[in-house]
């Protein structure tokens, strides 16, 4: 809440006694805000502006009614301020906060929601399923809160335009003004105004069919169902239809098309569609209340979101630089001929021009790309021609548009004699191209130790870095050129320089599994546990890539087997997740810890379970690890196996002694998750090993509730045979039997 300030009195002619009813609301004027007001939303009866408060330096949203800019005593002004007072009293994380009223212009001052409304987001962004389900769930939480107030507060204008999103795409709903408006309207006026406001699609059929029908909580539930449809399909309901057609269709029991509902949608989304259909039932009495809706959306969201995050795959693209294309010239202008002739004899000129079948140069190539005859002659590889040209006054370090010098070209072409000639004429060994590649980089890339030695003898920087921080030693390690690496090391090259991502030459050699380079670098004193930017060591990379010999050598040399990366993954975690049995055993022999946890709380057993690696699971069980270790959301390995539907893994864990009745933070047991996934054998295994058929999660759902909701008769029969009770409500307001009756399956 913003700081309280002295309230200015409203014009008594405008609001009368309402000035005494504003409670703790602040009264603003336009002068309190900076001059620039940005229009962020516009509807039939209001506009929303973004403005910054001068003193508080904070952005606010100001909802103004264009028709209420003049001071007036109309009932609509009263309605506006009553809405503000009503909204200000509501404090909930998914309800937009009200800070006050604005006198000039007339409006309500609210918190500013950076991501705007859901109405603007749906047509412009492709939302992922977890985000869609979360938006639906958070909207249901907000509506459940409003309906739980005594007396219940009905929204009566629930639509994507009134569902606002913050920076992190979390929901806050707004606009509660329609309730008072409806009380002052006839049914005809209400429908006409709804059409103008764009809310006709969200009106339930009973409002069209019953003249004196007063809206109840079921009204909002119906509107919520249409919102669910819009979120799932990201389309407008009844697009292109006129007002009368919509009214007739809705009154007749027709709803937005379900053609977009695909069999490929996740199971949880199909269950959300089932909930949507129940919420827009033609009979208001059959629509669920928001308390049950919120419970169900919470269940679907929690079941959809696997708490497991895979360790990121390390991707190292082989670094390479290619020489420029020096197109052969066709003709030389008179000016270029004269320019060359001024410094070269006529016989020599003829010789220089004989560079290709066309026996000529192109003037535009020379000038536009800064390619000189010396570049062409070096690229042609003619030592004598280059020697002759260098005997005249030419720039030995001339650079093309991309920064290539003759020495760079000669080095990349592996022409040591040309390199020696250019160096004898003073060529700069450290002049780099536009990517920062010096001649020594190219020599290292090519494995050309002869040229590399020549360059070093003439002052080349052994630790020269290109633009991404790669040194010649990085390139030698990448390309497995042990000869160049030995030369660089003998010239005191830095053994552990970090490139832009933090990789050292040892990281690179370990990644590619170049055992000779790994031995050379480690033997010369390279830092074994150097960390790149994500804190992974060479051992992490070698394990992920399955480079057994590199791993063995690093461990023998003393590399830490328990080093953790930025996500808390050790090499053993990675081996477990990747299913690398031999490497896993090797790490254990060198003392790797079995109980280390990632930042999400996962042990190696969780990761092996998640990926279904039975050999590693048995190896861990033999090592007496905690089979019921709690990870993220207090999930055990058995929870993960049940969630994944891995029946063989579930049986393996149960046979090793895993607890079938462990409950995670929301009270879900492995049996709940197995029922949700529909894994028949997995359910049978759990029941055989003593799973509690009556286990309730924190909101009272039993496995039988889930089976009934899914309409899975076969599983429900198995549960009933195991003594599940289908006519007991437990902690929720409906029994499994009632859910089964409502299920369309």
Swiss-Prot record:
GO molecular function, one term: protein serine kinase activity
Pfam short name (any one): PK_Tyr_Ser-Thr
Catalytic activity: L-seryl-[protein] + ATP = O-phospho-L-seryl-[protein] + ADP + H(+); L-threonyl-[protein] + ATP = O-phospho-L-threonyl-[protein] + ADP + H(+)
Top EC group: transferase
Start and end residues of each Protein kinase domain: 34-301
UniProt xrefs under InterPro entries: Ankyrin_rpt (IPR002110), Ankyrin_rpt-contain_sf (IPR036770), Kinase-like_dom_sf (IPR011009), Prot_kinase_dom (IPR000719), Ser-Thr/Tyr_kinase_cat_dom (IPR001245), Ser/Thr_kinase_AS (IPR008271)
GO BP term, example: regulation of cell cycle process
Keywords: ANK repeat, ATP-binding, Kinase, Nucleotide-binding, Repeat, Serine/threonine-protein kinase, Transferase
Classification via SUPFAM superfamilies: Ankyrin repeat (SSF48403), Protein kinase-like (PK-like) (SSF56112)
ANK repeats: 369-398, 402-431, 435-464, 468-497, 501-530, 534-563, 567-596, 600-629, 633-662, 666-695, 699-728
Domain of life of the source: Eukaryota
Residues at which ATP binds: 40-48, 63
Record PROSITE patterns: ANK_REP_REGION, ANK_REPEAT, PROTEIN_KINASE_DOM, PROTEIN_KINASE_ST
GO CC, any one term: nucleus
EC number: 2.7.11.1
Location of the active site: 157
Family, as annotated: Belongs to the protein kinase superfamily. TKL Ser/Thr protein kinase family.
PANTHER family (alphabetical): ANKYRIN REPEAT AND PROTEIN KINASE DOMAIN-CONTAINING PROTEIN, ANKYRIN REPEAT-CONTAINING PROTEIN-RELATED
UniProt name for this protein: Ankyrin repeat and protein kinase domain-containing protein 1
Lineage, opening ranks: Eukaryota, Metazoa, Chordata, Craniata, Vertebrata
Gene for this chain: Ankk1
């Amino acid at each position: 809440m913003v700081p309280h300030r002295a309230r200015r009195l409203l014009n008594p002619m405008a609001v009368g006694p309402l000035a005494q009813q504003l409670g703790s609301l602040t009264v603003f004027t336009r002068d309190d805000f900076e001059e620039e007001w940005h229009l962020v939303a516009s509807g039939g009866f209001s506009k929303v502006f973004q403005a910054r408060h001068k003193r508080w330096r904070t952005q606010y949203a100001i909802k103004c009614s264009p028709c209420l800019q003049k001071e007036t005593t109309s009932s609509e002004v009263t309605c506006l301020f009553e809405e503000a007072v009503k909204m200000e009293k509501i404090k909930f994380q998914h309800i937009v906060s009200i800070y006050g009223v604005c006198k000039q212009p007339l409006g309500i001052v609210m918190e500013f929601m950076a991501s705007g409304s859901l109405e603007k987001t749906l047509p412009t962004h492709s939302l992922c399923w977890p985000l869609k389900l979360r938006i639906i769930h958070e909207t249901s939480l907000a509506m459940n809160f409003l309906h739980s107030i005594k007396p219940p507060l009905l929204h009566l204008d629930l639509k994507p335009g009134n569902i606002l999103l913050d920076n992190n795409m979390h929901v806050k709903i707004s606009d509660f003004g329609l309730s008072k408006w409806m009380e002052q309207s006839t049914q005809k006026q209400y429908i006409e105004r709804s059409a103008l406001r764009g809310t006709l699609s969200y009106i339930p059929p009973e409002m069209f069919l019953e003249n004196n029908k007063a809206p109840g909580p079921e009204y909002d539930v119906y509107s919520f169902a249409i919102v669910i449809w819009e979120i799932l399909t990201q389309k407008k309901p009844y697009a292109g239809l006129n007002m009368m057609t919509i009214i007739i269709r809705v009154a007749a029991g027709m709803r937005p098309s379900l053609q977009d509902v695909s069999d490929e949608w996740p199971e949880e989304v199909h269950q959300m569609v089932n909930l949507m259909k129940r919420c827009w039932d033609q009979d208001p009495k059959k629509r669920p209340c928001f308390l049950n809706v919120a419970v169900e959306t919470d269940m679907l969201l929690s079941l959809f979101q696997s708490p497991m995050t895979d360790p990121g795959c390390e991707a190292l693209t082989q670094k390479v630089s290619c020489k420029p294309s020096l197109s052969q010239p066709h003709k030389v202008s008179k000016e270029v001929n004269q320019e060359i002739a001024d410094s070269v004899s006529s016989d020599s000129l003829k010789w220089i021009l004989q560079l290709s079948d066309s026996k000529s140069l192109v003037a535009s190539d020379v000038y536009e790309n800064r390619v000189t005859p010396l570049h062409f002659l070096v690229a042609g590889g003619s030592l004598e021609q280059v020697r002759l040209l260098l005997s005249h006054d030419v720039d030995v370090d001339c650079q093309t548009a991309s920064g290539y010098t003759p020495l760079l070209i000669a080095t990349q072409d592996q022409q040591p004699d040309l390199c020696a000639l250019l160096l004898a004429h003073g060529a700069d060994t450290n002049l780099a191209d536009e990517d920062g590649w010096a001649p020594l980089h190219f020599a290292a890339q090519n494995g050309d130790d002869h040229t590399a030695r020549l360059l070093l003898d003439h002052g080349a920087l052994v630790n020269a870095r290109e633009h991404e921080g790669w040194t010649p030693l990085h390139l030698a390690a990448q390309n497995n050129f042990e000869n160049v690496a030995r030369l660089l090391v003998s010239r005191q090259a830095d053994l552990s320089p970090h490139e832009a991502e933090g990789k050292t030459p040892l990281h690179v050699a370990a990644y590619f599994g170049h055992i000779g380079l790994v031995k050379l670098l480690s033997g010369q004193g390279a830092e074994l546990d150097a960390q790149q930017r994500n804190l992974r060591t060479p051992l992490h990379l070698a394990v992920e890539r399955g480079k057994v010999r590199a791993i063995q050598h690093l461990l023998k040399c003393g590399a830490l087997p328990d080093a953790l990366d930025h996500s808390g993954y050790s090499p053993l975690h990675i081996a477990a997740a990747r299913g690398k049995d031999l490497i896993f055993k090797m790490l254990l022999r060198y003392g790797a810890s079995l109980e280390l946890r990632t930042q999400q709380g996962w042990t190696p057993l969780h990761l092996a379970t998640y990926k279904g690696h039975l050999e590693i699971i048995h190896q861990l069980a033999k090592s007496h690890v905690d089979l019921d270790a709690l990870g993220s959301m207090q999930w055990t390995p058995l929870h993960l196996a049940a969630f994944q539907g891995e029946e063989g893994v579930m049986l393996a864990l149960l046979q090793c002694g895993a607890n079938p009745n462990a409950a995670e933070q929301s009270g879900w047991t492995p049996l709940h998750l197995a029922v949700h996934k529909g894994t028949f054998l997995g359910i049978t295994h759990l029941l055989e090993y003593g799973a509690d058929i009556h286990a309730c999660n924190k909101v009272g759902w039993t496995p039988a509730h889930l089976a009934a909701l899914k309409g899975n008769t076969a599983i429900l029969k198995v549960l009933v045979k195991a003594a599940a009770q289908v006519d007991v409500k437990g902690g929720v307001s409906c029994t499994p039997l009632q859910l089964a009756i409502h299920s369309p399956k």
